[in-house]
Curated annotation (Swiss-Prot):
Residues 296-305 have a biased composition (Polar residues). Residues 286-351 are annotated as: Disordered. Transmembrane segments: none annotated. This is Dysbindin. It comes from Homo sapiens (Human). It is linked to Hermansky-Pudlak syndrome 7: A form of Hermansky-Pudlak syndrome, a genetically heterogeneous autosomal recessive disorder characterized by oculocutaneous albinism, bleeding due to platelet storage pool deficiency, and lysosomal storage defects. This syndrome results from defects of diverse cytoplasmic organelles including melanosomes, platelet dense granules and lysosomes. Ceroid storage in the lungs is associated with pulmonary fibrosis, a common cause of premature death in individuals with HPS. Keywords: Albinism, Cell membrane, Coiled coil, Cytoplasm, Cytoplasmic vesicle, Endoplasmic reticulum, Endosome, Hermansky-Pudlak syndrome, Membrane, Nucleus, Phosphoprotein, Postsynaptic cell membrane, Schizophrenia, Sensory transduction, Synapse, Ubl conjugation. Interacts (via its coiled coil domain) with KXD1. Interacts with CMYA5, PI4K2 and RNF151. Component of the biogenesis of lysosome-related organelles complex 1 (BLOC-1) composed of at least BLOC1S1, BLOC1S2, BLOC1S3, BLOC1S4, BLOC1S5, BLOC1S6, DTNBP1/BLOC1S7 and SNAPIN/BLOC1S8. Interacts directly in the complex with BLOC1S5, BLOC1S6 and SNAPIN/BLOC1S8. The BLOC-1 complex associates with the AP-3 protein complex and membrane protein cargos. This BLOC-1 complex also associates with the BLOC-2 complex in endosomes. Binds to DTNA and DTNB but may not be a physiological binding partner. Detected in brain, in neurons and in neuropil. Isoform 1 is expressed in the cerebral cortex, and hippocampal frontal (HF). Specific expression in the posterior half of the superior temporal gyrus (pSTG). Higher expression of isoform 2 and 3 in the HF than in the pSTG while isoform 1 shows no difference in expression in these areas. In the HF, detected in dentate gyrus (DG) and in pyramidal cells of hippocampus CA2 and CA3 (at protein level).
Length: 351
């Protein structure tokens, strides 16, 4: 449409220029034709003047119109140039739009592929997230196992330390117990020796009196012979023993021999600790009422019962009167009992 309008404007301009050229050529021809006029024909100046003025006016009008047409053509040309530039831009835009529209199927295919890739990436991200959660759980388990291993090592070290402390404590208790046992045995041996000495002296005096007179007759009470320290022995109980009815010397010899044989039998069983007590004569001191009621033969029975007690106990013979009180070291016995029960309890606590 614009091209046809432009062609028309160009054709009008060409026609206008060709018309001007034809007019100028005609005026020149008229001038050339007017020259060969001869003198006989006289010009009519008034008619020519009118004609010339009319031509001049016409040419002036034509020239003015030509200028107006030229200015209008220039304006139209500028407008046409502007419109052509504008429509060229529109054309390029339309061409680009057409090209973009032609690229729409490829763009849609790319979008579909991108959507599929995004779906695949979403699945991959979910898998990675699950793997990260699993890795976090594994890290937590590893940390827990490491803490458990450290705690177990600390527990083992604590057990080892406690076992060492227990062994040290047991060794100390054993040493203390052995020391106390030795002290108690020494004290007991001293008491036994002192008591044995006292009874030997009393028995020797009574035996000498019996061998010399044949009977025992105590006229007055005698003071205890020897120092008994912590042991309280009532010697008057021995003085109240009445042996006057023993008239048979053979029975006395049998009694003495039986006592010596029993002592020799007991000495190997008692071991080295009782070697000092082999010559000890054990007597059971009866009450005064029992002495009056029982015959003199009860002394042998007392000796046999004491001998059986010694053999059953398996320890050094201890002679006690009815009124004597021997207190056992309860602290030592308690510590010994705790020591025997401690290893089992310590092992239970360690486990």
């Amino acid at each position: 449409m614009l091209e046809t309008l432009r062609e028309r404007l160009l054709s009008v301009q060409q026609d206008f220029t060709s018309g001007l050229k034809t007019l100028s050529d005609k005026s020149r021809e008229a001038k050339v034709k007017s020259k060969p006029r001869t003198v006989p024909f006289l010009p009519k100046y008034s008619a020519g003047l009118e004609l010339l003025s009319r031509y001049e006016d016409t040419w002036a009008a034509l020239h003015r119109r030509a200028k107006d047409c030229a200015s209008a053509g220039e304006l139209v040309d500028s407008e046409v140039v502007m419109l052509s530039a504008h429509w060229e831009k529109k054309k390029t835009s339309l061409v680009e739009l057409q090209e973009q529209l032609q690229q729409l199927p490829a763009l849609i295919a790319d979008l579909e592929s991108m959507t599929a890739n995004l779906t695949h990436l979403e699945a991959s991200f979910e898998e990675v997230e699950n793997n990260l959660l699993h890795l976090e759980d594994l890290c937590g388990q590893c940390e827990l196992e490491r803490c458990k291993h450290m705690q177990s090592q600390q527990l083992e070290n604590y057990k080892k330390n406690k076992r060492k402390e227990l062994e040290t404590f047991k060794a100390e208790l054993d040493a203390e117990h052995a020391q106390k046992v030795l002290e108690m045995e020494h004290t007991q041996q001293m008491k036994l020796k002192e008591r044995q000495k006292f009874f030997e002296e009393a028995f020797q005096q009574d035996m000498e009196q019996y061998l010399s007179t044949g009977y025992l007759q105590i006229a007055e009470r005698r003071e205890p012979i020897g120092s008994m320290s912590s042991m309280e022995v009532n010697v008057d109980m021995l003085e109240q023993m009445d042996l006057m009815d023993i008239s048979d010397q053979e029975a006395l010899d049998v009694f003495l021999n039986s006592g010596g044989e029993e002592n020799t039998v007991l000495s190997p069983a008692l071991g080295p600790e009782s070697s000092t007590c082999q010559n000890e004569i054990t007597l059971q001191v009866p009450n005064p009422s029992e002495l009056r009621a029982k015959p003199p033969s009860s002394s042998s029975t007392c000796t046999d019962s004491a001998t059986r007690d010694i053999s059953e106990g398996g320890e050094s013979p201890v002679v006690q009167s009815d009124e004597e009180e021997v207190q056992v070291d309860t602290a030592l016995a308690t510590s010994h009992t705790d020591r025997e029960a401690t290893p089992d309890g310590g092992e239970d606590s360690d486990s």
